[in-house]
Amino acid sequence: MIKLIKISIITFLILGFLNTSYSKENFFDEGLRLFQEKKYEDAKFLLERSIVFNPKHAKSYLYLAKIYKEEKDQKNEEKNLEATLLIDPSNEDAILMLMEIGIEKTNYSKVKELSERFTKVSKKLCNENKKILKD
């Protein structure tokens, strides 16, 4: 009888863990789908939940930044981009978006620093980099 109870408890713990693991990715995937459908408030909620379950998920921060960009909330956009780069220093999208913010703020020293970083990170998007520096 005691063995049966122990086995039942272990089974429930394992199933609970598997369910939690699945929900981490499910929040991000569902948030991404809503983002693509331009349902930003719902997407923001799910991406924030994704971060609660997995604080080191760089893509969740990146897509939150993209939502804040759509909402014209530059402070939160920049905060989430910085978080993205802390987790994934070679994230090309985050570097480019921060460069755009730096240009808007006329913070050219930061743009130059990010440009050098971007050049090291990316070969495939160098044309984007040259375009931004010309502007």
Model-derived regions: residue spans:
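Register position in tetratricopeptide repeats
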Residues: 36-37, 70-71, 104, 135
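Canonical tetratricopeptide repeat
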Residues: 63, 97, 131-135
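Residue-level recognition of tetratricopeptide repeat
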Residues: 57, 91, 125-126
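Canonical positions in the second alpha-helix
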Residues: 50, 83-84, 117-118
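Structural marker of alpha-solenoid helical repeat scaffolds
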Residues: 53, 87, 120-124
